[in-house]
From Swiss-Prot:
The gene is PER1. It catalyses: a hydroperoxide + [thioredoxin]-dithiol = an alcohol + [thioredoxin]-disulfide + H2O. GO terms for biological process: defense response to fungus. One of its GO terms (cellular component) is cytoplasm. Thiol-specific peroxidase that catalyzes the reduction of hydrogen peroxide and organic hydroperoxides to water and alcohols, respectively. Seems to contribute to the inhibition of germination during stress. It comes from Zea mays (Maize). This is 1-Cys peroxiredoxin PER1. It is found in: Nucleus; Cytoplasm.
Length: 229
């Protein structure tokens, strides 16, 4: 379905949240932010997801990435539900002797207008009143307020926060090097990145004094070049 996608500017909506009124562009500020929706409060998969996101919040904070949740429940519902989220997350963290706290705001969109503008509507899910429900959507928004990456999951599939964090690390790595590098399949921080096709070998030698390795492939085109970044 058409809607907000990579490269589009996220709409500058103002909504009530668990932290008061929030205007999205002001919240994103000069850094990165993750805006993620969940179908409904007090539901099983959403509770595990929100607890997982809360558990990863410090990792995102280390990277200068803010978190912003949203669903169609009201603010009071969010506040009551986060007690369950924190209790569940705390039980999962007992072995690490840590606690789970939802420190980031959750937006309330009972009118469903924001989830439509953010392209977060699940076409297959309705509530008891027949109203639209959010999908498990996630947008990573950059300092320019444009969408850099999107995930879209159905209600039946919880998101993997390790993959969200890995994808954010990939975006930040590419941005740090001006788009001159990209990350290959299954990449993890600390592993080699690949040099963008538009970078000549001569330019690559200047940009990456640590050197690079070109994969020996049948085509002999020399396009697959790995370097430590």
């Amino acid at each position: 379905m058409p809607g907000l996608t990579i490269g589009d500017t996220v709409p500058n909506l103002e909504l009530d949240s668990t932290h008061g009124k929030i205007r999205i562009h002001d919240y994103v500020g000069d850094g990165y932010a993750i805006i993620f929706s969940h179908p409904a409060d007090f539901t099983p998969v959403c509770t595990t997801e929100m607890a997982a996101m809360a558990g990863y919040a410090k990792e995102f904070e280390k990277r200068g990435v803010k978190l912003l949740g949203i669903s169609c429940d009201d603010v009071e519902s969010h506040r009551q539900w986060t007690k369950d989220v924190e209790a569940y997350g705390g039980k999962q963290q007992q072995q690490q002797a840590t606690t789970t706290k939802v420190t980031f705001p959750i937006l309330a969109d009972p009118a469903r207008d924001a989830i439509r503008q953010l392209n977060m509507v699940d076409p297959d899910e309705k509530d008891a009143a027949g109203r639209s429900m959010p999908s498990r959507a996630l947008h990573v928004v950059g300092p320019d307020k444009a969408v850099k990456l999107s995930f879209l999951y159905p209600a039946t599939t919880g998101r993997n926060m390790d993959e969200v964090l890995r994808a954010v690390d990939s975006l930040l790595t590419a941005a740090k090097h001006g788009g001159k590098v990209a990350t290959p399949a299954n990449w993890k921080p600390g592993e080699c990145a690949v040099i963008a096709p538009g970078v000549s070998d001569e330019e690559a030698r200047k940009m990456f004094p640590q050197g690079f390795e070109t994969a020996d492939l049948p085509s002999k085109k020399g396009y697959l070049r790995f370097t430590k970044v």
